[in-house]
């Protein structure tokens, strides 16, 4: 005869009575107890050890999160229902007063807006007209070199384009050469 190990299996009617545990999800309830005693402790029996039904932390956190979201949803729905009933309960005018308003409307005076004063225009500074161009000067000499005429250069003699001014002092006579010669008094 051959020696073979036989796998002992529980009969089907016993498997229905005692659940097989998924070990990672359970804690040990008690050792060396019978199946009946394990069941009376509301535990599950697996390979001679009685396991207590336990739920891991991540499953507990998941269920807590579901309860929290469901509670927030229910609170939000209740809040919206309450706000909706408050909007519906706004005081409405009775139908009699609405009919009276329609029968005899009273015109409301609408105030006309007061026109703002128009600001006065700011006067622009008066600009002096440019000096007229003399017939003897070219427009370039007249317009662009005014600063040269006001301050003659030391090495260039001043050109007289205008008529000579009469001397304010009758004793001093001005000569065309540009130098003044004092005269003796008579």
Swiss-Prot record:
Spans within the Cytoplasmic topological domain: 78-151
Membrane topology category: Single-pass membrane protein
Residue intervals annotated with topology Extracellular: 1-56
Broad class of the protein's primary localization: membrane
Keywords from the named record: Membrane, Transmembrane, Transmembrane helix
Transmembrane segments: 57-77
A single cellular component GO annotation: membrane
Compartments, record wording: Membrane
Region Disordered: start-end pairs: 104-138, 151-186
InterPro entries xref list: TEX29 (IPR031685)
Domain of life: Eukaryota
Claim: Ribonucleoprotein is one of the keywords in the record: no
Biased amino acid composition, Pro residues: 108-133
Protein name stated in the entry: Testis-expressed protein 29
